[in-house]
Regions:
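C-terminal lobe/lid and adjacent interdomain/linker elements of RecA-like ASCE P-loop ATPase modules
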Residues: 157-162, 175
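Helix-rich C-terminal "collar"/helical-bundle subdomain used as an assembly and partner-interaction module
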Residues: 226-307
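A short helix-loop-helix "switch/interaction" segment in the helical subdomain of ASCE P-loop NTPases
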Residues: 170, 174, 179-193, 212-215, ...
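C-terminal helical "lid" of AAA+/P-loop NTPase domains
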Residues: 101, 181-187, 193-205, 242, ...
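P-loop/Walker A NTP-binding region and its immediately flanking N-terminal helices
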Residues: 1-151, 160, 166, 183, ...
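Amphipathic alpha-helical repeat elements characteristic of tetratricopeptide repeat
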Residues: 142, 159, 178, 215-223, ...
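Conserved C-terminal helix/linker of AAA+ ATPases
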Residues: 181, 199-226, 271-275
Length: 307
């Protein structure tokens, strides 16, 4: 089986990790020099390198695998996980100096689970530290924010994002044209991990294939939707999105709409109005009884605006 490009090109040291802010690089280097980490809360969009940075730090500190507990909180997010799995790990002595709990997607932990986590962090802070990652820091309770050093990871700008993806294609000997690559960028930005996966999955005989219209079995239905939008097949694209999108993806779909204003009109007035339509749809999404109907209505408004 081919090696996953996301793993092949994952940074493993501070020197290979791409920091958007030199001050953050210095801060991270300072933690490594001290030989221990504080409680940390990494926030940022999906695929921007939060978990990668956490693993870079643990690698730089040469923490024994036995002293690391990694949990994906989108799957294990209740009080029982905190009370049993995490407490059992935190309460025993480390093999080295300090144990570390890496909690991915901590914003998915239930409020009761977060309250229980606060107590564990306080009780075992001398021998166990916590690294939390989240996409939506506002979903993390203030008590956890106050116990962690916040660290927001900015997304790459779209030019750097595209260049990074193109460089990987060059390194892998993949033939690609810019229009095709741009389709993948539009479907996945700012999630670099997702974009790399999509590109690798759609390489045939060392050529990056263009997504086919209406292919619901595509590795990512959003690629097909973009092709439909570009071809003026708004109804088909709307049907595909509403049938394939999971509720937790709706925020990302609204952000996709905003990033690609050119799909909703060529004039400045049309694009300004599209921003208002998207804003209204996103604001209503969490309030209405059926968010799918709200999403569909927003797409219809955008289609009418583009005429």
């Amino acid at each position: 089986m081919k090696e996953l490009w996301t793993e092949k090109y994952r940074p493993s040291s501070i020197g290979t990790y791409v920091f958007r802010d030199e001050g953050q690089r210095q801060q991270v280097s300072g933690w490594v020099e001290e030989g221990a980490l504080p409680h940390l809360l990494f926030s940022g969009a999906p695929g921007t390198g939060k978990t990668t940075l956490a693993k870079v730090l643990l690698n730089e500190l040469e923490v024994d695998d036995m002293d690391i507990l990694e949990i994906n909180a989108s799957n294990e997010n209740n009080v029982d996980t905190i009370r049993n799995k995490i407490t059992n790990f935190s309460s025993t002595m480390p093999f080295g100096d300090i144990k570390y709990v890496l909690l991915d997607e901590a914003d998915y932990i239930t409020p009761n689970g977060q309250a229980a986590l606060r107590g564990v962090m306080e009780m075992y802070h001398t021998s166990c530290r916590f690294i939390l990652t989240c996409n939506y820091p506002q979903r993390v309770i203030p008590a956890l924010h106050s116990r962690c050093q916040g660290f927001h990871i900015e997304k790459l700008d779209i030019t750097e994002f595209t260049a990074r993806l193109a460089q990987i294609c060059i390194d892998e000997g993949v033939e690609v044209d810019l229009d095709t690559l741009d389709t993948y960028v539009q479907a996945s930005y700012p999630d670099l991990r997702k974009s790399i996966n999509l590109v690798q999955q759609n390489v045939v005989d060392n050529v990056l294939q263009r997504p086919q219209d209406g292919d619901k079995a595509s590795s990512d239905w959003m690629l097909s939707a973009i092709e439909m939008f570009k071809a003026g097949k708004y109804k088909d694209a709307r049907t595909l999105i509403c049938s394939q999108a999971r509720p937790e993806e709706y925020d990302d779909i609204y952000k996709f709409m905003y990033r690609n204003l050119e799909l909703w009109g060529n004039t400045e007035q049309q694009q300004d109005q599209a921003v208002v339509i998207i804003r209204n749809g996103m604001a209503k999404s969490s309030l209405c009884a059926d968010p799918e109907i709200n999403l569909s209505a927003t797409l219809i408004e955008l289609q009418m605006n583009s005429l």
